[in-house]
Amino acid sequence: MAHHNGPRKKTRYKFKKDLRKRGIVPVTSLIQHFEIGQSVHIVCEPSIQKGMPHRRFHGKTGKVIGQRGRAWMLTIFDGNMEKIVIARPQHLKAQK
């Protein structure tokens, strides 16, 4: 087969959900609100492609710096480099 370079390549196991967590996503995850400066975890929701950050940021933790439309802007350190990631709330979980 030909070599493909899609945004979800090499995510066969990374984006796999637990059997009991499959199905419709709760509405509360869609309407989450975060405070600026709050720490959040990036956990990509594989059943919703819209607003999903790049697979390299899956499992990382960042700080909320603002909102852009329905999405949230986060700062994340990728090595020593600070990067801005834009993701919808379905793919974010507040740090406890």
From Swiss-Prot:
HAMAP family per UniProt: Ribosomal_eL21
GO biological process terms on file: translation
Annotated organism of origin: Methanosphaerula palustris (strain ATCC BAA-1556 / DSM 19958 / E1-9c)
Entry keywords, A to Z: Ribonucleoprotein, Ribosomal protein
Record's keyword annotation contains Transport: no
Family as reported in the entry's similarity comment: Belongs to the eukaryotic ribosomal protein eL21 family.
Listed name of the protein: Large ribosomal subunit protein eL21
Molecular functions (GO terms): structural constituent of ribosome
InterPro entries per UniProt: Ribosomal_eL21 (IPR001147), Ribosomal_eL21_arc (IPR022856), Ribosomal_eL21_CS (IPR018259), Ribosomal_eL21_sf (IPR036948), Translation_prot_SH3-like_sf (IPR008991)
A GO cellular component annotation in the UniProt record: ribosome
